[in-house]
Design a protein with these regions (language model features):
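Residue-level "edge-of-site" marker
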Residues: 33, 116, 179-180
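Glyoxalase I/VOC metalloenzyme domain signal
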Residues: 56, 66-112, 123-176, 183, ...
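Histidine-acidic metal/acid-base catalytic patches
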Residues: 1-75
Length: 260
């Protein structure tokens, strides 16, 4: 007896909504607080998930019927994820030397130094890892809270501005970081655990983020056979799973696959 919000389960609600739209129905939609876990959870989180699920459902219905439906919020379509552009770690100054030794042992090279921040770019194949040891700002706060860990993930999509517009329409929280002169303002939203999710594309200046924001060191990689990032796995509290499932599935062009 599994009760969850639209977009969190497997029931074809968009098909039901398509049939409902064909009748000309333009009334209200409502959600019941379905299960005891929702009732015992954060009222704010459940309310946000419920609101987001209805926004997604109406958008999905409009796309399937090929016209606007009452209540649908105009937004760009879900974005296919083309690649992981970089993975950013918040690292303390004390732990940074050991982290750098680990990266070198894995065949990574320090390919760039940020033009204005205590941030380095490490590279091997198509894998880019950013080490951020800034003494203030988002990464510093994240490191204090979580320790040395991944603080941001950058995904390449066809249109970064369209992705951030869809994210905003779906009630995701935009993040505005400090941007120095001549540096890129990379669109981002808050993600799991307070981390950041950046959007990049290859059709705008954002596609040159590495050369714009970093000075090349010329250091060559001692290649260890690592070529790219083939998947991303995130750990969370059991109670958060449905929230973040909806976050990703409503924002991106995704499909569910059986777990191993």
């Amino acid at each position: 007896h599994w009760r969850c919000l639209p977009g969190q389960g497997d029931l074809n609600l968009s098909g039901f909504m398509r049939a409902l739209a064909a009748t000309g129905y333009d009334g209200v939609l409502s959600l019941e607080i379905f299960n005891d876990r929702f009732r015992a959870g954060s009222a704010r989180s459940v309310a946000l998930d419920g609101h987001r699920s209805l926004i997604w459902l109406l958008d999905e219905t409009a796309r399937q019927v090929g016209k606007s439906v009452p209540g649908a919020v105009p937004m760009p379509p879900p974005a296919p994820v083309e690649a992981v552009e970089f993975i950013e770690f918040a690292v303390s100054e004390a732990e940074r030397p050991g982290f750098e030794r680990l990266l070198r042992a894995l065949g990574f090279a320090r390919a760039g130094a940020h033009r204005s921040k205590d941030v380095d770019l490490w590279k091997q194949g198509d894998i880019r890892i950013v080490l951020n040891s800034e003494a203030d700002g988002f990464a510093h706060s994240y490191q204090i809270t979580h320790g040395t860990s991944v603080c941001a993930l950058a995904l390449r999509v066809p249109d970064a501005q369209a992705a951030i517009a869809r994210a905003t329409a779906l009630l995701d929280v935009p993040h505005a970081g400090a941007v120095g002169p001549g540096e890129l303002d990379i669109p981002a939203v808050r993600g799991l655990g307070g981390s950041l999710l950046y959007f990049l594309d290859h059709t705008s200046a954002l596609g040159r983020w590495a050369e714009v924001d970093f000075e090349a060191t010329g250091e060559a990689s001692d290649h260890a056979g690592l070529t790219g990032v083939d998947h991303v796995s995130q750990s969370m509290q059991y109670e958060e799973m449905l929230t973040w499932l909806l976050f990703y599935s409503s924002l991106f062009e995704t499909r569910k696959t059986p777990s191993q």
